[in-house]
């Protein structure tokens, strides 16, 4: 029997459905259907959890089968996570969070430069930190720095730690798609009564105002309304959240209905409860995770408020991570009064560090690291710093080349463009570029001074906008200025409103301008695109409808900076511009956006 080649995968899932005439609504040959049923629920392939670990009280080979992984000296358990848990193995999923590195680095910098020891585990609860969060001043803060989170914070108004636990769990695809966000906020602000589908749900849903958010609540709901044991409730959570647990789910469903009937819950109420629990199981976030994440939210917020220079330096050293680019982080630092300085061969370490600066907020400036220069890499940057610590400062560019033989001409040119030879050698950037080309020919196998004696001609210094362009190209950060500030006079003549004036200006239609930092089109937004613009005074939220995107698609999708005319909206402390017209804005090159779905 020859089976025609085609894809029946979607039909197999509904193979038991019949049409009006009683015949199956598919054309799957019986042999294919029979074979599909035989392999149903079998593992499709073997996979390894990238951060999964188990702990056992004896050699694990005595408990479950083990095989060697492809990585040297790495062993892999042949059971899946559910079987490991059922056998009593303690299972951990290790998350790689860049914010942990950023916090570690910030605490180390505070200890090194101020002699103060910060224990993140014992940070005091601070009303000023929560006030900062209510203003959505959260660029760089863990988990709540996205556009959606920043738009929610002024409405949620977090004033205690558990509010952050809810915030972390609330702004996720599941609660958004499940319609939980707006009801929770309305109930929190007293705009909607707190209700429960059944009085027995108050015990499990009371702390989240009747809105289910956490997986633990699903388990407590089963215990309260159906008399499940904790073990049965956990099985229900696993079965509801798995696409491969239909048989187990059907068994637990009968148990759930029996338990509800014993407590007088029958008919439509029982069906609604089951449907609500089944829908919620697909997106419920573990409360334990949310609490852990919320503490990182608070710790990063506390550091941003009380140790801003160390906070920004820690973030810059942990890149790439988070929602915002290094340039946006540096601009946010400037808006908070923190001085950010370009890297310097004599003053910088491999990574960003702190320098005493009375003019900077908190008394310290951020000095960018040598490793921030494009194409240099951490290994070369660390070698440059280590060589300087061991044998003293570099005398000139030729001395650098002779002591760091692996450095290349493109790397020297990037360092010159980024201003690394300015403060230490007193060289203008164009002069440094000239000298770098000559010095690159000096190596340890040649006599000193033979190649680099060429005297650079008198070259003009760079204009401020040229310095900003050079910084953006060399390091991705322009500490001395934002691209829009060099256009501000022309933008003012056009009536363009700055970001800081949008909260108070008396107008319904405005022009705004800025560099595009983000473009987002979430699956939950029905085609609406959200953009962030940044000018020298702050951030601007742009909402682009489907129709507007179609009209201005090439500009909206490809321009590095935009002029936007739109309707000004101010709702519960959140300011948005609903775009009606877009045109490209020519600014300093080198600024790129981060685009997400």
What residue ranges belong to the model's regions?
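Single conserved hydrophobic/aromatic residue that forms the stacking wall/gate
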Residues: 1-12
């Amino acid at each position: 029997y020859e089976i025609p080649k085609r894809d029946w995968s979607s039909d197999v899932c509904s193979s038991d459905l019949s049409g009006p005439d009683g015949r199956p609504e598919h054309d799957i040959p019986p042999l294919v259907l029979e074979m599909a049923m035989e392999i149903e629920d079998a593992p499709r392939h073997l996979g390894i959890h990238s951060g999964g670990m188990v702990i056992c009280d004896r050699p694990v080979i005595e408990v479950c089968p083990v095989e060697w992984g492809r990585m040297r000296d790495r062993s892999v358990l042949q059971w899946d996570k559910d079987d490991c848990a059922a056998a009593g193995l303690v299972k951990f999923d290790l998350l790689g969070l860049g914010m942990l590195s950023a916090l570690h680095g910030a605490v180390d910098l505070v200890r090194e430069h101020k002699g103060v020891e910060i224990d993140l585990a014992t940070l005091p609860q601070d009303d000023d930190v929560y006030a900062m969060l209510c203003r959505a001043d959260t660029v760089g803060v863990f988990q709540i720095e996205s556009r959606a989170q920043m738009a929610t914070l002024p409405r949620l108004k977090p004033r205690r730690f558990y509010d952050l636990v809810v915030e972390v769990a609330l702004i996720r695809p599941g609660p958004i798609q499940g319609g939980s966000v707006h009801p929770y906020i309305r109930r929190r602000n007293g705009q909607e009564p707190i209700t429960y589908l059944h009085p027995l749900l108050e015990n499990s849903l009371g702390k989240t105002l009747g809105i289910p958010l956490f997986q633990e609540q699903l388990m407590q709901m089963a215990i309260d309304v159906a008399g499940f044991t904790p073990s049965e409730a956990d099985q229900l959570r696993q079965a509801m959240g798995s696409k491969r647990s239909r048989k187990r789910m059907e068994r637990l469903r009968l148990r759930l209905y029996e338990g509800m009937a014993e407590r007088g819950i029958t008919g439509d109420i029982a069906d609604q409860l089951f449907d609500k629990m089944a829908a919620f199981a697909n997106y419920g976030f573990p409360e334990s995770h949310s609490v852990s994440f919320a503490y990182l939210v608070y710790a990063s917020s506390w550091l941003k408020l009380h140790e801003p220079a160390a906070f920004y330096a820690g973030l810059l050293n942990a890149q790439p991570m988070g929602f915002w680019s290094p340039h946006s982080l540096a601009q946010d630092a400037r808006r908070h009064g923190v001085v950010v300085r370009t890297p310097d061969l004599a003053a910088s370490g491999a990574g960003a560090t702190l320098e005493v600066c009375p003019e900077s907020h908190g008394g310290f400036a951020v000095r960018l690291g040598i490793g921030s220069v494009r194409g240099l890499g951490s290994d070369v940057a660390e070698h440059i710093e280590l060589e300087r610590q061991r044998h003293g400062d570099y005398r000139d560019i030729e001395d650098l080349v002779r002591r760091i033989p692996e450095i290349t001409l493109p790397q020297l040119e990037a360092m010159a463009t980024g201003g690394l030879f300015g403060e230490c050698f007193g060289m203008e950037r164009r002069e440094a570029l000239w000298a770098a080309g000559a010095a690159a020919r000096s190596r340890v196998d040649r006599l000193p001074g033979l190649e680099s004696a060429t005297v650079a001609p008198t070259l003009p210094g760079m204009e401020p906008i040229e310095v900003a362009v050079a910084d953006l190209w060399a390091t991705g950060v322009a500490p001395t200025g934002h691209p829009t500030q060099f256009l501000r006079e022309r933008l003012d003549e056009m009536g363009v409103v700055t970001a800081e004036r949008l909260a108070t200006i008396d107008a319904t239609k405005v022009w705004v301008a800025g560099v595009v930092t983000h473009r987002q089109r979430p699956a939950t937004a029905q085609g609406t695109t959200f953009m962030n613009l940044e000018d020298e005074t702050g951030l601007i939220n742009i909402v682009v409808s489907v129709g507007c995107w179609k009209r201005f698609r090439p500009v909206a999708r490809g321009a590095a900076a935009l002029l936007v005319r739109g309707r000004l909206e101010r709702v519960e402390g959140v300011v948005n511009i609903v775009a009606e017209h877009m045109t490209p804005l020519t600014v300093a090159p080198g600024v790129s956006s981060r685009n997400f779905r």
